């Protein structure tokens, strides 16, 4: 698998506990809005790892998205359900996924799928000694199983997709989660993210959407 393969395993494996820590310490809206910045980090990693140039359009996008993330971070100080610690965990997941997607591009001559169980099983084994994984399992078994199935399918597709499209394009598709997740959590769990999170998140999503629509219209 090589050093890059093991690095991929570490990046992907570490995102699961970091994601849980993010959701536990800040609002779901903050988490997914920060995730929306993944194309930006993917572009940066593609530049440093693959040598792909960063256009003026992307540089402007990076500037505006960074400002949007600052607005979200500020909102965490004004909202009881948000916290900057959770925002940092979400940012780590975002950066790790972007780096992992770029590594898939670099290793596109081989299938990275066999590395996924290594990554997640390794993460699960380590976490087993620090948690109580079977607490409440009987009561919530159906939720555990649904979560496992959805995560497994989504992760496999994420591992396959960047072999055929660029990592920024793959990251862009994840923006659908950014739009749907806060609305579902707000509707079902009544978790209002706060005006700062909504404003900063809207800035991030709209900037990325306009930036990429501009590219698609030129093709």
Question: Which residues fall in each region the model found?
Answer:
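Specific transmembrane alpha-helical segments of multi-pass solute transporters/efflux pumps
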Residues: 1-30, 35, 43, 70-71, ...
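Transmembrane alpha-helical segments that form core, pore/gating elements
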Residues: 42-44, 78-135
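Membrane-interface helix-cap regions at the ends of transmembrane helices
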Residues: 1, 17, 66-81, 121-141, ...
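C-terminal transmembrane-helix exit sites in multi-pass transporters
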Residues: 19, 38-60, 179-199
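Hydrophobic/small/kink-forming positions within alpha-helical transmembrane segments
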Residues: 9, 13-17, 39-44, 70, ...
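Hydrophobic transmembrane alpha-helices of multi-pass small-molecule transport proteins
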Residues: 12, 45, 57-76, 93-94, ...
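Helix-helix packing/entry segments at the starts of transmembrane helices
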Residues: 31-37, 104-122, 152-187
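Structural signature of hydrophobic alpha-helical transmembrane segments
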Residues: 21-38, 82-95, 137-151, 197-198, ...
């Amino acid at each position: 698998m090589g050093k890059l393969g093991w690095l991929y395993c570490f990046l992907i494996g570490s995102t699961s506990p970091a994601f849980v820590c993010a959701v536990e310490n800040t609002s779901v809206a903050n988490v997914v809005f920060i995730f929306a910045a993944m194309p930006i980090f993917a572009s940066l990693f593609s530049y440093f790892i693959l040598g792909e140039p960063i256009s003026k359009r992307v540089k402007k996008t990076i500037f505006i998205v960074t400002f949007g993330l600052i607005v979200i971070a500020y909102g965490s100080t004004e909202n009881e359900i948000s916290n900057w610690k959770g925002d940092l965990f979400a940012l780590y997941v975002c950066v790790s996924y972007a780096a992992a997607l770029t590594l898939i591009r670099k290793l596109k001559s081989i299938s990275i799928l066999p590395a996924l169980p290594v990554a997640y099983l390794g993460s699960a084994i380590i976490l087993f000694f620090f948690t109580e994984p079977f607490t409440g399992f009987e009561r919530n078994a159906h939720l555990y199983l649904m979560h496992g199935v959805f995560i497994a399918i989504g992760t496999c597709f994420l591992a396959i997709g960047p072999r055929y499209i660029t990592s920024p394009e793959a990251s862009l598709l994840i923006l659908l989660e950014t739009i749907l997740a806060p609305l579902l959590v707000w509707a079902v769990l009544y978790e209002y993210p706060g005006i700062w999170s909504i404003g900063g998140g809207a800035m991030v999503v709209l900037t990325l959407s306009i930036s990429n629509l501009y590219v698609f219209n030129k093709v």
